[in-house]
């Protein structure tokens, strides 16, 4: 059966003292790519600490996640640290328009044709309310995708059980994705791994809702649990690693793999049938 493998993670590279895991997670991604040469990497923001400057990308991202075999398979979304440099210009210059968008339109979509899915890369660091250009674009992009499974990435998670505060901003994204029967939401920002049960934008459990993953485990120093969040099914606060997703037209499988190649969390679920 046709499938698409994805390797997703955020919050990777920077000075080694505060980013001790980037080299190991990049090596892990390389091992997965060796087994799955057509896999895609999804970089979930805050790729080069602390300000997303040009020299930080050059000195910290390039030697690890920015090597040609990984960079050539990477698509991304920007994080809050990227915008600590004016307009996140180094981020857009480093990844290029095809894989990052532009400062003027920093969101994009592309088909995952092998699996029949649709990928959205959104920007949680700019306006996203009902009248914003980004949300208007999102509505247009989602129109007519009733029969296509949808995966969306952006940096700040709506919910999480770690040290970073929940963000209300993505509620606009979630409302549109739920209405379009979106399947998966992938975020970084919080420096831990967490998987949520399918739910609605108002946090009500719904077997036909979207499933959120937080994967801020790319290398930045990890943070611990600070609260218990409704619908959280599994979380790890002590392991660097990546989320490997295997997408098929009728289902998806997830595996959180740590840098020692151990699968710490795994499962499989049929795609959403609500309204199809």
How would you label these PLM feature ranges?
Residues 10-11, 45-46, 79, 154, ...:
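Active-site flanking residues adjacent to catalytic metal/cofactor-binding acidic residues
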Residues 1-56, 128-133, 140, 160-161:
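N-terminal active-site segment of His-dependent metallophosphoesterases
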Residues 27-30, 49-150, 164-184, 191-244, ...:
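Extended active-site neighborhood of metal-dependent phosphoesterases/phosphodiesterases
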Residues 224-225, 232-276:
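A short C-terminal boundary segment appended to hydrolase-like catalytic domains
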């Amino acid at each position: 059966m046709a499938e698409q493998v994805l390797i997703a993670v955020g919050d990777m590279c920077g000075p080694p003292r505060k980013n001790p895991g980037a080299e190991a997670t990049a090596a892990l991604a390389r091992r997965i790519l060796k087994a799955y040469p057509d896999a895609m990497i999804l970089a979930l923001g805050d790729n080069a600490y602390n300000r997303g400057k040009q020299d930080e990308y050059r000195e910290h991202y390039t030697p690890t996640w920015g090597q040609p075999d990984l960079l050539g398979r990477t698509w991304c979304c920007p994080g809050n640290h990227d915008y600590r440099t004016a307009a996140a210009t180094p981020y857009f210059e480093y990844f290029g328009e095809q894989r990052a968008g532009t400062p003027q339109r920093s969101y994009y979509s592309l088909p995952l044709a092998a699996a029949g899915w649709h990928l959205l890369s959104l920007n949680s660091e700019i306006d996203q309310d009902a009248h914003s250009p980004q949300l208007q674009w999102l509505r247009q992009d989602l129109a007519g995708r009733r029969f296509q499974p949808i995966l969306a990435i952006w940096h700040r998670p709506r919910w999480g059980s770690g040290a970073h505060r929940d963000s209300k901003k993505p509620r606009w994204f979630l409302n549109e994705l739920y209405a379009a029967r979106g399947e998966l939401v992938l975020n970084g920002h919080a420096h831990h791994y967490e998987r949520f049960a399918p739910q609605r934008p108002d946090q009500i459990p719904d077997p036909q809702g979207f499933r959120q993953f937080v994967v801020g485990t790319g290398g930045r120093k990890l943070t611990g649990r600070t609260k218990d969040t409704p619908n959280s099914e599994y979380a790890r606060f002590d392991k660097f690693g990546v989320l490997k997703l295997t997408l098929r037209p009728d289902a998806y499988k997830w595996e959180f793999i740590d840098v020692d190649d151990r699968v710490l969390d795994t499962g499989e679920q049929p795609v959403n049938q609500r309204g199809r």
